[in-house]
Amino acid sequence: MLNAFQLENHRLSRLDADEQGTLLDAVWVDLIEPGDDERERVQHELGQSLATRLELEDIEASARFFEDEDGLHIHSFFFYADAEDHAGNATVAFTIRDGRLYTLRERELPAFRLYRMRTRSQTLIDGNVYELLLDLFETKIEQLADEIENIYSDLEALSLVIMDGHQGDEYDNALSTLAELEDVGWKVRLCLMDTQRALNFLVRKARLPSGQLEQAREVLRDIESLLPHNESLFQKVNFLMQAAMGFINIEQNRIIKIFSVVSVVFLPPTLVASSYGMNFEFMPELRWSFGYPGAIMLMILAGLAPYLYFKRKNWL
C-alpha cells in the first residue's frame, strides 16, 4: 500500500496516490508492505531507493542508522499487538531526503494509525520533515507508556490472585500470564532502547532546527523516565513468579504430607494381614454365596473412593 501526504498551512492532507505525478507534491510517502510496482514507481517518480526486507531485519547499528547519497536513514522498532494479542516489534525504515520523509514498513502499526488520526485536527508547529519524524516517535513513546501502565494494572490484579489464591489452576494461569507480561515488557524495553539510539543518532547527524532539536531532547528525556519503570516491571514479575512457585511448593508439600500420613495409617493393618493372611479355620465369609463378588466390589470402592476424594481436593 502506498500513501502520500502533502503539507498545506502546516496541516497534513492525504493525496490521491493512485494518480501519476502526485508523489512530487508529497512531503511524506508512507509505504506498507509495498509491491514491486510501488517500489518502481517511487524510484521512477522520486528517484528514491527503498530498503529491502533483508535490510529491515538487520540489527547492526551501522545498518540501522546511517547517511549516504540516498539520504538520512533510520531503522527503528515500533511496538504492536495483533488480533490474538501477540506482542511484537516491527521495524520501520525512515529516510529523509530533499525535504521529504519516506517510511517503509511491513504492517500497519498503532502509532502510525493514531498519528494519522491526530493530524486531521492538529497542525504542525514548524512544518518540516524532522517534525513529522519526531511526532511519530512521540506517538510511539506515548503508546509504550500506555503499555507499561497496562502491565502495571495486570500485575496488580495477578498479585491479588497469587497472594489470595488457593487453587492450583489459579497458580497455573497466573504463571502463564506472568510469562506473557514479561515477554511484553521485554519487547517494550527493546523498543525504548532502540528509539533512544535512533534519536541520539538523529541529534548527532542531522542539522535539526532549534525547535526539533528541543523536541528530540524532550523525547529522550521521556525515554529515560520510562526505562526505570520498565525495569521495575521485571522485578515485580520476578517477585510474583517466585511467590507463585513458593505457594505451589507449599501446596505440593502439604499434599505429599497427606499421602504419607494415609500410607502410615494403613501400614499396620497391611502388616497384620500380610503376616496372618486368610488362614483362619473359622471364616464365615467363606460360606457366603456373594462373598467373592462382594470382595471385588469392595476392592473397587476402596480404590475409587480415595481417588475421587483426592480429585475433588485438587490433589491429583
From Swiss-Prot:
Cell membrane listed as a keyword: yes
Molecular-function annotations in GO: cobalt ion transmembrane transporter activity; magnesium ion transmembrane transporter activity; nickel cation transmembrane transporter activity
Reaction catalysis annotation: Mg(2+)(in) = Mg(2+)(out)
Motif Probable selectivity filter location, chain numbering: 277-279
Pfam assignment, any one: CorA
Localization, UniProt: Cell inner membrane
Chief place where the protein resides: membrane
GO (cellular component) term, any one: plasma membrane
Entry's free-text remark on domains: The central ion permeation pathway is formed by the first transmembrane domain from each of the five subunits. Mg(2+) binding strengthens interactions between subunits and leads to the formation of a symmetrical homopentamer surrounding a closed ion permeation pathway. Low Mg(2+) concentrations trigger both a conformation change within each subunit and a loosening of the interactions between subunits. This results in an open ion conduction pathway. In addition, this results in a less symmetrical shape of the whole complex.
Subunit structure: Homopentamer. In the absence of Mg(2+), interactions between subunits are weakened, and dimers, trimers and tetramers can be observed in vitro.
Protein family membership: Belongs to the CorA metal ion transporter (MIT) (TC 1.A.35) family.
Protein known as: Magnesium transport protein CorA
Species of the source: Sodalis glossinidius (strain morsitans)
